[in-house]
Amino acid sequence: MINTILWDVDGTLLDFLAAEKYGMETCLDEIGVKLTEEMLSVYSRINRSWWEKHEKGLCTREEIFEGRLKDFFGEYDIAYTDYDHFNRRYQIALGEAVFPVDDSLTLLKELGKSCKQYMVTNGSRVAQELKLAKSGIDKLCDGVFISEIVGIQKPEKAFFDYVQKATGYVKEETLIVGDSLSSDIKGGNNAGIKTCWYNPKGGSVNGDVSVDYTIKNLWELKEILAK
């Protein structure tokens, strides 16, 4: 029986793409650049590729923040090089943008009556702490684990070992829910816990991962927990 849930935040409980759009629109506007849908798509692709490198241990968090902006600005000949300032402003904008998915806050309230719930996220400390506070998620869960603070990121087993030591969760009674196969599901596999892939777009499993459950709507989780 599942009595502990490890939740991913961005792309699972909160709409990250909507937040990303808000963040880039806000920050580009401040330097006199208008964001188009094509530019947003290119930035999303660049950002995703950098985070995938990070998950594989091929780059640091700091290299992500500078590298993705260098690549994106270079793509559109944007003559702006204060990457550190732009990134700091961007992290704050991301934290200000809260777009719950599938009425997720109500779901957290309901599940909190019978389960322990912890947030496990690779997002930046600034953005995560802001959005968790603004959304109220920090008050609806039993703890928050941000990889930047922990010093290790998903999907590394050591990240989950840290969470287990801090919470005392029992592997056989714990489920991770997330949208990323390479971070959340692979991390759950490494940790030896059950996995639930949030897959609203009906994608296919790829890579060396094992998925125990797949859901298209977060509320389907209630059926899984009732088994």
Task: Enumerate the predicted regions with their spans.
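Glycine-centered short loops/turns at secondary-structure junctions
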Residues: 114-115, 192
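N-terminal helical cap/lid subdomain that shapes the substrate entry/recognition surface
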Residues: 2-102
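Short, conserved clusters of charged catalytic residues that mark active-site
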Residues: 102-103, 158
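Catalytic-core regions built around general acid/base machinery
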Residues: 103-114
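Asp-based, Mg2+/Mn2+-dependent phosphohydrolase catalytic module
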Residues: 1-5, 18, 29, 109, ...
